[in-house]
Every structure is written in structure tokens, then in C-alpha cells.
Amino acid sequence: MPPPDAELILGQLNGQLAVLEGARAELEAGWVQGGWWSVTSADGDQRLATGDAGGSPAHVDGSCLVGALARAGSSSDVGRAVDAVYDALWASRGQPGPGGLPPVPPPEVRQARVRTLTQWNDRAGRTREEVLALVDRAISATIMDLMAAPRSDPADAPPAVRAG
């Protein structure tokens, strides 16, 4: 199976970066534990919602790590962002990440990663600063992957200029 072309890799990494940056903004606006996000109901009570059961409200008062990722982009970009944050979590514990654009994992693996990140977010004593630091680690790794990603040669470049 041939490797994906350079433009596809760059597009996927840029989409991943956009989700990570959007999730960071969501978390800065408000962070929660015990649900994917909190919303204020019509009677003024704050309610936690988790996953698809909570719908996708236009405004939330706060998001957990996974909820912020889910709200920040399209499903394919969100999936890759989940993988990037999961890899950043392991890197923060001294385990090297795969780097670059790893293959898309099976749905069961991604679901396990979502559970792990949800449990990590919800651990007693966890702080918003720790969550933001993890997202920052994923953002930094994604930027480094973008810098190292292959680039397509311009079609009109002279042969001596083309990478080869």
C-alpha cells in the first residue's frame, strides 16, 4: 500500500492542529469533570452531559478534555486529535510517541483512548492547568510533525530543485 501523499498528510495534520487549538480555547473558557460539558438549563441549573446523549449544544459553560475535543471539529479531525492527546499523555510519562501521522486505529482502540483520557481528566485532584499542559504538549508535537512532514515538489520546479 503506497504511503499517503504529502498534501493529504499536511491537510490531516493541519486539521488535527485546528481541533487541538479549538479544544484549548474551549478549556480556557471553562473546564469540568464528571461530564463532557456543562450547560445551564432554562431553570438556571448547571447540568453535566456526556457524549452523544448530551447532544451538541451551541453554548456550553465548560468542557472536559474529551468534550472540548469533540466540540472543536469534524469527526475525522477529532479522532486524530484524540490520538495526539493520548500520545501526549504517554509522552508525559516518558513513553515516546509515534511521531508523524500514524495509521488510523480501529474504533475499539480509539474508544479505549477516549475512556483513558476521560478517566485521566476526571481523576480527583486534576487541575485545568494540567489538562491545558497536556493539550499544549499535543499541539507542540503536531507542530513538530507539520515541520517534518514531506512536501510536494512544485510541478514546474526544475529537476535540480526537486527533492530526490
Label each residue range with its predicted role:
Residues 1-164:
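Domain-length accessory/inserted modules outside core catalytic folds
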